[in-house]
UniProtKB/Swiss-Prot annotation:
Catalytic activity: a ubiquinone + NADH + 5 H(+)(in) = a ubiquinol + NAD(+) + 4 H(+)(out)
Residues annotated as transmembrane: 3-23, 69-89, 100-120, 137-157, 171-191, 223-243, 246-266, 278-298
Name this protein carries in UniProt: NADH-ubiquinone oxidoreductase chain 1
Superkingdom in the source lineage: Eukaryota
PANTHER family linked to this entry: NADH DEHYDROGENASE SUBUNIT 1 (PTHR11432), NADH-UBIQUINONE OXIDOREDUCTASE CHAIN 1 (PTHR11432:SF3)
Its membrane topology: Multi-pass membrane protein
Gene Ontology CC terms, in alphabetical order: mitochondrial inner membrane
Molecular function terms from GO: NADH dehydrogenase (ubiquinone) activity
Cited function: Core subunit of the mitochondrial membrane respiratory chain NADH dehydrogenase (Complex I) that is believed to belong to the minimal assembly required for catalysis. Complex I functions in the transfer of electrons from NADH to the respiratory chain. The immediate electron acceptor for the enzyme is believed to be ubiquinone.
Taxonomic placement: Eukaryota, Metazoa, Ecdysozoa, Arthropoda, Hexapoda
Length: 310
């Protein structure tokens, strides 16, 4: 029963990725004063399934000098890594509440760097390798700030369980108590998922499409799905940590949709950053702010519970 329920949840998650791409294309269309996809099905609602079919039935070509087996396996491993992190999502039949959910999330999200690196290396292409190096350095840089932000809230709550974050936000959200930290978190999430304005793996002028430049058809679709799976799960974690959401309420899913739309909105409005400014932002701005908040939360905890240390 557990296996059936988990597989059913993964199917629902994969379908949600399709409709998330439809929402993105529709939103970008209306923001740019055009219609977006509206031909397949009623108002284009079947467009994701049409795109998926057209990608997976294409002929798969392999670069002559690529490492064939690793090149073939890498997108599948990237998708498995993105799906594996959804074990953290609690649902009724198999309510998995990890006591170490925070550490599990950090471990799984940091594993995505290896997928980027192997994809760029196995293609044996100069452009994909260059995009891979930039993506990996960006992901590792922002992973540090992301971990420090989560460490600060761990010091405040004394728990790695995501459900405890909801219990501590029944009266006021953490996004209101620590607004700068919330902005830092959202920026780090965009950099972690290679989204605009931090999408340096896809610099069209010099890198074509980044680390996945040699992939096409079904292999590209797997990389695309894994990227959007990560975006949806990052939005879900943001809802839990900063917006006090209960999984059993409708408001949780409304907040999740609004956060997903926020990622789309930023993509449609902001230009791409310069790479040196990106690194400056990670190491000189976000990391000090997160360290200051760690010190602040630790001092607050010490003042409130100082009698335990006597």
């Amino acid at each position: 029963m557990y296996l059936i329920s988990f597989v059913l949840m993964l199917v629902c998650v994969l379908v949600s990725v399709g409709f998330f791409t439809l929402m993105e294309r529709k939103s970008l269309g209306y923001i740019q004063f055009r219609k977006g996809p509206n031909k397949v099905g009623y108002m284009g609602i079947l467009q994701p399934f049409s795109d998926g079919m057209s990608l997976f039935i294409k002929e798969q070509l392999f670069p002559m000098n690529s490492n064939y087996l690793i090149y073939l396996i890498c997108p599948i491993l990237g998708l498995v890594q993105s799906l594996f992190i959804w074990v953290l999502f609690p649902f009724y039949v198999n309510c998995v509440e990890f006591d170490l959910g925070l550490l599990f999330f950090l471990s799984c999200s940091s594993m995505g760097v290896y997928g980027l690196m192997i994809c760029g290396w196995s293609s044996n292409s100069m452009y994909s390798m260059l995009g891979c190096i930039r993506s990996v350095s960006q992901a590792i840089s922002y992973e540090v700030s992301l971990s420090m932000i989560l460490l600060g809230f761990f010091l405040l709550i004394d728990s790695y369980n995501f459900m405890d974050y909801f219990y501590y936000q029944k009266f006021v959200w953490f996004s209101i108590l620590s607004l700068p930290m919330c902005f830092c978190w959202l920026s780090c999430c965009m950099a972690e998922t290679n989204r605009t304005p931090f999408d340096f793996s896809e610099g069209e002028s010099e890198l074509v499409s980044g680390f996945n430049v040699e992939y096409g058809g079904g292999m590209f679709a797997l990389l695309f799905i894994s990227e959007y799976l990560s975006i949806i799960f990052i939005c879900l974690v943001s809802c839990i940590i900063f917006f006090g959401s209960d999984f059993n309420s409708l408001f949780f899913y409304i907040k999740l949709i609004f956060l997903c739309f926020f990622f789309i909105w930023v993509r449609s409005t902001l230009p791409r950053f310069r790479y040196d400014k990106l690194m400056f932002l990670a190491w000189k701005c976000y990391l000090p702010i997160s360290l200051y908040y760690i010190y602040f939360f630790f001092s607050l905890k010490s003042l409130c519970f100082y009698h335990f240390f006597l």
